[in-house]
């Protein structure tokens, strides 16, 4: 299957459960592989560019909420941890992110879109605006994954991962 995103045209291969297991750029230089566990959660993403693995992440979950990402290229070091609102019935509102040695807090709108990310001093590290269908424009230098509808944004694909599908 071919899809077009703002980062290019991708060939997508699906497994028997209809989950995207690989994305290959039109020129073949970039390959993104995804693995899923028995509950259908994406447990890993590996990005290969020009034959070299550029990133390889493993994800840890509490239920269906991603709570941590591990760098498989760097001794399984923790890349980031996420804290979700425990008062939400489905706990889908992100509250905080620890990335590296830095703490960030999320500002969300009523649709659970991340609108701002604040650093520990209260300065806006990133701000986002969205179209009705999730196309994002952002400001700030912070690169972090939780954006539209409180879901994971894959920067390489410019798609949002909704636990079962990419949109």
Place the predicted regions along the sequence by residue.
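Extracellular/periplasmic catalytic domains that process cell-envelope and extracellular macromolecules
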Residues: 52-53, 60, 86-90, 99-100, ...
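Short, solvent-exposed loop/turn segments that connect beta-strands within catalytic domains
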Residues: 26-29, 50-55, 73-77, 87-91, ...
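Aromatic-rich beta-strand edge motifs centered on tyrosine
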Residues: 9-19, 32-41, 56-65, 79-92, ...
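Pocket-edge structural micro-motifs
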Residues: 63, 70-71, 86, 99, ...
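A motif-centric feature for acidic-aromatic and gly/ser/thr-rich catalytic loops and repeats
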Residues: 10, 97-163
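Beta-turn initiation residues at beta-strand->coil junctions
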Residues: 2-8, 16, 22-28, 44-50, ...
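Acidic/polar residues at beta-strand termini and the immediately following turn/coil
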Residues: 25, 37, 71-73, 85, ...
């Amino acid at each position: 299957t071919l899809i077009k995103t703002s980062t290019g045209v991708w060939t997508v291969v699906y497994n028997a459960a209809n989950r995207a297991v690989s994305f290959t750029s039109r020129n073949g230089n970039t390959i993104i592989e995804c693995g899923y566990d028995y509950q259908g959660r994406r447990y890993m993403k590996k990005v290969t560019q020009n034959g070299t693995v550029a990133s390889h992440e493993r994800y840890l979950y509490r239920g269906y909420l991603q709570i941590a990402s591990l760098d498989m290229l760097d001794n399984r070091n923790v890349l980031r941890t996420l804290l979700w609102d425990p008062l939400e019935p489905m706990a889908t509102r992100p509250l905080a992110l620890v990335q590296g040695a830095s703490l960030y807090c999320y500002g969300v709108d009523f649709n659970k879109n991340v609108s701002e990310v604040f650093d520990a001093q209260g300065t806006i590290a990133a701000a986002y605006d969205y179209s009705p269908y999730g196309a994002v424009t952002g400001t700030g230098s912070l690169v972090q994954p939780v954006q539209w509808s409180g879901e994971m944004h894959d920067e390489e694909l410019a798609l949002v991962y909704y636990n079962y599908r990419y949109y």
